[in-house]
Amino acid sequence: DLKGIYYIPRIIKASKLGDAAILKEIIKILAQNKIKTENSLKFNPELILKKGNYSKIKPNKQDKLDIKKAIKTLKSLGQYNFSQGVVVRNNKVVSIEGIGGTKKMLQKSKSNKFKNHGVLVKFPKKKQDLRVDLPTIGLETLKQSKTAGLKGIIVKNKQHVFLDKMKCINFANKNRMFISVIWKRFLY
């Protein structure tokens, strides 16, 4: 209807600040029209994995060091509300997700030297609205991680969308990769 035209300037203005700002502006507009925004996972709980490991391979000691380094890096970037993904290999940050997204980050992370070594940690940004904007992992992410030479993917409990769950688990098992969901106790 024509009422939507009224809001276009606000959305265009928000677009200059990025996709998170667009979503926040849309949520404000909906609230002004007495429409409540619900968490999308409330209606699709099958899209999340609960805490734990989802493949036969589990993170080893080096993987856990890489995971901790990645989490520390994401926390330090949190003040800038900049990135939701980081790749760490041998306790060194290899790449940080930027405007190009996860695919671009994983392309930059490719290693001919290392195979099945290193991790992708993908957490929401500090100011991300988790009702409508969650990090998403799917089969393509796993394939790109494998191509980059990574061993595993880590997401945060109840703060992600996981597509094609069984295909991803089967792919991880076949390629000796891990998929792990961590919870608050692990983070600190």
Model-assigned labels for residue ranges:
Residues 1-4, 27, 164-169:
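Short Gly/Thr/Asp-enriched flexible loops that form oxyanion-binding sites at enzyme active sites
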Residues 1-7, 16-20, 31-146, 155, ...:
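Conserved mixed alpha/beta catalytic, RNA-binding, or beta-rich assembly cores of soluble enzyme
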Residues 143-188:
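C-terminal binding/interaction regions
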